[in-house]
From Swiss-Prot:
It comes from Actinobacillus succinogenes (strain ATCC 55618 / DSM 22257 / CCUG 43843 / 130Z). The active site is at C64. Belongs to the GlpE family. The keyword Nucleus does not apply. Keywords: Cytoplasm, Transferase. This is Thiosulfate sulfurtransferase GlpE. It comes from the Bacteria. One of its GO terms (biological process) is glycerol metabolic process. One of its GO terms (molecular function) is thiosulfate-cyanide sulfurtransferase activity. It catalyses: thiosulfate + hydrogen cyanide = thiocyanate + sulfite + 2 H(+); thiosulfate + [thioredoxin]-dithiol = [thioredoxin]-disulfide + hydrogen sulfide + sulfite + 2 H(+). Its EC number is 2.8.1.1. Its main location: cytoplasm.
Length: 111
């Protein structure tokens, strides 16, 4: 099993058109401060909820800080049987640089 690396723009397109889920694997403090709009915070504690909510054929996109550790998580999810797994190139930093929608502690920041 493998995963595919995609741009933040492609990730946003997949979220909108393919109902893909974006998994943010950063620490809780950073996630609560700012995140990609609609992101699911994937942790050891929330993994069961993720498994219960999303089938193996659901498109799954993983994002971290810089696009490095998301590759390991994407590979793990593919090994677990998820068929459509992607990693965001540049991670959350890339998402911000692309000017894509975000949620912050202060509300939603639109495009």
């Amino acid at each position: 099993m493998a995963f595919t690396e995609i741009t933040p723009e492609r990730a946003w397109d997949m979220i909108q058109t393919e109902n893909a889920v974006l998994l943010d694997v950063r620490d809780a403090e950073r996630f609560s401060y700012s995140r990609a709009q609609g992101a699911f915070h994937l942790t050891n504690q929330s993994y069961g909820e993720f498994q219960d909510t999303y089938d193996f054929d659901h498109p799954v996109i993983v994002s971290c800080y810089h696009g490095i550790s998301s590759r390991s998580i994407a590979a793990f999810l593919a090994e677990q049987g998820y068929d459509n797994v992607y990693s965001v190139i540049g991670g959350f930093e890339g998402w911000q640089r692309a000017g894509l929608p975000m949620e912050t502690a202060y509300g939603v920041k639109p495009i």
